[in-house]
Amino acid sequence: MKWSEISIHTTEEAVEAVSHILHEAGASGVAIEDPAELTKEREQQYGEIYALNPAEYPADGVVIKAYFPQTDSLQETIASLKSSIDVLPSYDIEIGTGNITINEVDEEDWATAWKKYYHPVQISDTFTIVPTWEEYTPSSPDEKIIELDPGMAFGTGTHPTTTMCIRALEKTVKPGDTVIDVGTGSGVLSIAAAKLGAASVQAYDLDPVAVESAEMNVRLNKTDDVVSVGQNSLLEGIEGPVDLIVANLLAEIILMFPEDAARVVKQGGLFITSGIIAAKEKTISEALEKAGFTIKEVLRMEDWVAIIAQNA
């Protein structure tokens, strides 16, 4: 069977949004070629567990590759992708050139091609994220492993925003805490919260593909006794109180529910948000404060921020 490899040249800012669009369109695998991976700050602090080949990365911008079966509707799919990506600037998301190219690949080639971009990565003092097909031995008894299968949705959990959310969870989750993960994606943040001692984690996503992916990864990590996954739009209809809410979403989506977060998280509880480019930090902080939160800490990595806020 022949497959089409669709490559989109975009920006780091647009990676999560474009990846989501591709998964929504039915991509069977997504690979991200980001040259920032070659020099990023966390590489110096924690050390990558694998070697990267600069020749496989673009000179500038980010290239996102997605794999689709060749069908009669492929051109219609590509046109729909282009339309969805072209809308992103209206949400203040810079897409760069947005150029789309197409290559034909054999099934045996695509089935392994995208996996070369995913390897074990230590993202904090506590956690290492390991793709399911990689063998990995923890370097110490205290190291916690999160196994992820990125084939279905939302990558391997090593984007700066995810990394910062996990580090924020390390700082804040206490044994016995109740947690809600809004926009769970792969389920990585819910799994991390469970492994940090949370007693109950509710993971929600509007996308049924994300729900399926999160359920699979939760089972894979043997945290299904703590984490429940469901389909839901943000915090609509969700009752509290809980100790902590975490949401790694686009800034524009975070702005839609600070008041709901204040309603659901208990007094003195925490709201961790990321997916926020540095230029929008002030806007998000002001919205959180208006809803009754106090900004306790801001984490920064590359051009992204994560905010830890406390409900007054």
From Swiss-Prot:
Reaction it catalyzes: L-lysyl-[protein] + 3 S-adenosyl-L-methionine = N(6),N(6),N(6)-trimethyl-L-lysyl-[protein] + 3 S-adenosyl-L-homocysteine + 3 H(+)
Gene Ontology MF, one: protein-lysine N-methyltransferase activity
Pfam families reported in the protein's UniProt record: PrmA
SUPFAM superfamilies xrefs: S-adenosyl-L-methionine-dependent methyltransferases
Localization per Swiss-Prot or TrEMBL: Cytoplasm
Residues annotated as signal peptide: none
Cystine pairs: none
InterPro entries attached to this UniProt entry: Ribosomal_L11_MeTrfase_PrmA, Ribosomal_PrmA_MeTrfase, SAM-dependent_MTases_sf
A single cellular component GO annotation: cytoplasm
Enzyme class: transferase
Record: residues binding S-adenosyl-L-methionine: T162, G183, D205, N248
Swiss-Prot/TrEMBL GO biological process terms: methylation
Protein's UniProt keywords contain Electron transport: no
EC number from the UniProt entry: 2.1.1.-
Keywords: Cytoplasm, Methyltransferase, S-adenosyl-L-methionine, Transferase
Coiled-coil parts of chain: none
Assigned protein family: Belongs to the methyltransferase superfamily. PrmA family.
Stated role: Methylates ribosomal protein L11.
Designated name of the protein: Ribosomal protein L11 methyltransferase
Species of provenance: Bacillus cytotoxicus (strain DSM 22905 / CIP 110041 / 391-98 / NVH 391-98)
